[in-house]
Amino acid sequence: MAASAGPEIERLIGLLAKLPGLGPRSARRAALALLKRRDQLLAPLSDALAEAAARVKTCSTCGSLDTQDPCAICSDGTRDASLICVVEEVGALWAMERAGAFRGRYHVLGGLLSALDGVGPDALRVGPLVARASEPGVREVILALPATVDGQTTAHYLAERLAGAEVTVSMLARGVPVGGELDWLDDGTIAQAMRARRPA
Amino acid sequence: MAASAGPEIERLIGLLAKLPGLGPRSARRAALALLKRRDQLLAPLSDALAEAAARVKTCSTCGSLDTQDPCAICSDGTRDASLICVVEEVGALWAMERAGAFRGRYHVLGGLLSALDGVGPDALRVGPLVARASEPGVREVILALPATVDGQTTAHYLAERLAGAEVTVSMLARGVPVGGELDWLDDGTIAQAMRARRPA
Ligand SMILES: [Zn+2]
Ligand SMILES: [Zn+2]
């Protein structure tokens, strides 16, 4: 791209273009929208990013993101500590929360096993999951993983690893369409899959 | 949207969702990408936005955006001061610069006349354009406006207003597809339309 907009604006466009969903063209549109709406958009977004950079951290219990550690969900005494819902990423946790079908705790794996991408168990938060599942009072681990090859491989691997802990291991029902990533599903589908979950 | 990700992250998602090209879902993905790539993406974008908010201003001559006023283009002595290219918005100016087919100066109107949206001449930078066009040494004003109803209405209005100034008034050739916004065009189309421009 020619440096037509000055180095500061080109740098801003370049960074915006790295966001998923924004290509080089839409990044330019976004930069322009920001620069035209300085007080309503540019300044607040700048503040929100600075605050997120300074304050948001990873929950040492579940792996979610929050400004407190343990996170608000892990600290919430009204939530059912006997249920742990395992998700691939924080985006899937957010989708579960929006669906409002689950009132237990979470465990963010940080990815899926993948032979193709060379992701093994050590790259995921599997050990901490087994440890949490073995704590007294934990009754059920729900594997809310995508219905993809990697998702199902990971689910079966986790079911084996959790066999030693005295917990029921379940999976989301087949309401999740094949190949479907959780965070692209509508809330109703997620709620239904949660209600109809089955043993792994 | 349920406040599933904590107020700070929800605020960030809400602001990202206001960017053109990002809906609520892609804004969540973007927020997650930012939070996962703190050092490579979140911190640099936060800095770039803060710098843009502090340093980028509107050029008092042409209406473009830059960290200096007059902007780099208006200050560039190697550019042809006898040509003024009128564009709707800064995004169109950037598109012209990327096409590399124009080495004169610009004038950013700040919009188009629109009966429907109630945009009259006073809402646009028409007076300053007429003043600039009347300065000695200005030879041609090129109306690089979109080939839409509002774009063409605006072009004809400007041609009338510029009749008193001793300048040639031209328009981009019909290489610009009907309904086409300049900043979505490929560079070759823009360059061709510039070369084949015709009297307004
Ligand atoms: Zn937590
Ligand atoms: Zn300028």
Swiss-Prot record, chains A, B:
CDD domains: TOPRIM_recR (cd01025). Keywords: DNA damage, DNA recombination, DNA repair, Metal-binding, Zinc, Zinc-finger. The keyword DNA damage applies. The keyword Mitochondrion does not apply. GO terms for biological process: DNA recombination; DNA repair. A zinc finger (C4-type) spans 59-74. GO terms for molecular function: DNA binding; zinc ion binding. Residues 82-177 form the Toprim domain. Coiled coil: none annotated. InterPro entries: DNA_Rcmb_RecR, Rcmb_RecR, Rcmb_RecR_Znf, TOPRIM_dom, TOPRIM_RecR. It holds the Pfam family RecR_C. Belongs to the RecR family. PANTHER family: RECOMBINATION PROTEIN RECR. NCBIfam families: recR (TIGR00615). May play a role in DNA repair. It seems to be involved in an RecBC-independent recombinational process of DNA repair. It may act with RecF and RecO. This is Recombination protein RecR. The lineage of its organism: Bacteria, Pseudomonadati, Pseudomonadota, Alphaproteobacteria, Caulobacterales. The gene is recR.
